Amino acid sequence: METVSLSLWNAPRAEAPVVATVALPGSKSITNRALILAALADGPSTLTGALRSRDTDLMIDALRTLGIGIETAGGDTTLRVAPGPLRGGAVDCGLAGTVMRFLPPVAALAGGTVDFDGDEQARTRPLDTILNALRGLGADIDGDSLPFTVRGAGSLRGGRVTIDASGSSQFVSGLLLSAAAFDEGVTVHHDGTTVPSMPHIDMTVEMLRESGVEVSTPATGGEADTWRVSPGPVRAVDRVIEPDLSNATAFLAAAAVTCGEVTVPLWPAETTQPGDAIREILLAMGADVRRDGANLTVRGPQQLTGIDIDLHDVGELTPTVAALAALADGPSHLRGIAHLRGHETDRLAALAHEINSLGGNVTETEDGLTIVPADLHGGTWRSYADHRMATAGAIVGLRVDGIEIEDIGTTAKTLPGFENLWATMLSASAGTGRKASF
């Protein structure tokens, strides 16, 4: 499994308001869902604008291991997927939650044994919810966390299962994505506190329906907290992948914290991506946010204001929002995100520790963070092998001299070349002749 370098990266301070146009690669969440659906489809399909990152490459490698043909065409971001008989093999999940939670249902359909493992940090991530659910649907599985083994029998009965998905919406999405291939489909009932990151389940449902799969949800008159996928074919669909809006948030934040202006092209008019919520968040913090055709532009205020916000549905934006809050002019309260303690790291503890180590004033609450602005100083910002922790440190570094980020390379999980994109954004800003006033 992969060993990462723990070298330090000097986060550049913005010497001028950040003014740039930043084109982002495709969405990880959409790419990996599209790969699963294409692998189970009734014919070949093409994905255009697919993200190529560690997480998506792990998914591609895993599907190839299981017998799916995946080739590049006209560049790495165009993928041709040819379904085939599923077979056994060894799957490396790395740190990719979408691989370790979306692939086991596929493996249960394979005609052989599939062994799963991942990075050391991944072995603490909760997986028993989806593995126990699969057992209840007829799968033969050894283990409750990485490493574990799925003994595929070539088919899976399916049926009804009750789970507690309050720890991650991926438990629901993972079961739904493959369910049309189960003999009885699947009915997933959630019994627990509110499911986090509901937009990701909406994304899964939308993509299933685009593939001709019949899905019943609470929003369409189905049973409360219950999702039903009927058995049947998955239609092959050629897809154009949207830019990754969650990755875009760090670049838009750069405009917000430097009184600058950043434009992201091809921002979708309608989307299920949680990253779209950054528009309302930045507006609430005093930024100007506007659309011009397919472009989204953020213009930063003279001073960001604090925010009191429930991030339960968009928890992956928490590191970006915490970095913004640490540079605002008043206190912020980030709520509804207790589930982040089970992500790549305990993101709440990590954010509190790293901001406080720079002189900040952050307190963990039962379900979030209270952030009171303070004069920050330079120091080492640990990434915890967490891509969003690394980009949060880069945002803080725009305003604070001497920030050194440990293992910036972890951003390759969802955004390879982040450092170059960041440097290009800042070099474009240097040519504007504007001076920083923060």
Curated annotation (Swiss-Prot):
- What reaction does this catalyse? 3-phosphoshikimate + phosphoenolpyruvate = 5-O-(1-carboxyvinyl)-3-phosphoshikimate + phosphate
So where does phosphoenolpyruvate get bound?
28, 97, 125, 170, 347, 388, 413
Active site annotation, chain numbering: 316
Report whether Cytoplasm shows up as a keyword of the record: yes
Q: Which residues bind 3-phosphoshikimate?
A: 28-29, 33, 168-170, 316, 343
Q: MF terms per GO, please?
A: 3-phosphoshikimate 1-carboxyvinyltransferase activity
Q: Which CDD domains match?
A: EPSP_synthase
The cross-references to Gene3D superfamilies, in alphabetical order and at most eight, read: Enolpyruvate transferase domain (3.65.10.10)
* Pathway(s) where this gene product acts: Metabolic intermediate biosynthesis; chorismate biosynthesis; chorismate from D-erythrose 4-phosphate and phosphoenolpyruvate: step 6/7
Subcellular localization(s) per the UniProt record: Cytoplasm
Q: Provide the alphabetized UniProt keywords.
A: Amino-acid biosynthesis, Aromatic amino acid biosynthesis, Cytoplasm, Transferase
GO cellular component, as recorded? cytoplasm
Q: One Pfam family from the UniProt entry?
A: EPSP_synthase
Any idea of its EC number? 2.5.1.19
Which InterPro entries does the entry mention? Enolpyruvate_Tfrase_dom, Enolpyruvate_Tfrase_sf, EPSP_synthase, EPSP_synthase_CS, RNA3'P_cycl/enolpyr_Trfase_a/b
What top-tier enzyme class does this entry carry?
A: transferase
Q: Which GO terms describe its biological process?
A: amino acid biosynthetic process; aromatic amino acid family biosynthetic process; chorismate biosynthetic process
Classification via NCBIfam families: aroA (TIGR01356)
User: What PANTHER family does the annotation carry?
Assistant: AROM/DEHYDROQUINATE SYNTHASE, PENTAFUNCTIONAL AROM POLYPEPTIDE
Job description of the protein = Catalyzes the transfer of the enolpyruvyl moiety of phosphoenolpyruvate (PEP) to the 5-hydroxyl of shikimate-3-phosphate (S3P) to produce enolpyruvyl shikimate-3-phosphate and inorganic phosphate.
User: Family, per the entry?
Assistant: Belongs to the EPSP synthase family.
Q: Subunit arrangement?
A: Monomer.
Query: What is the protein name given in its UniProt record?
Result: 3-phosphoshikimate 1-carboxyvinyltransferase
Q: Which organism is it from?
A: Rhodococcus opacus (strain B4)
By which gene is this protein encoded? Answer: aroA
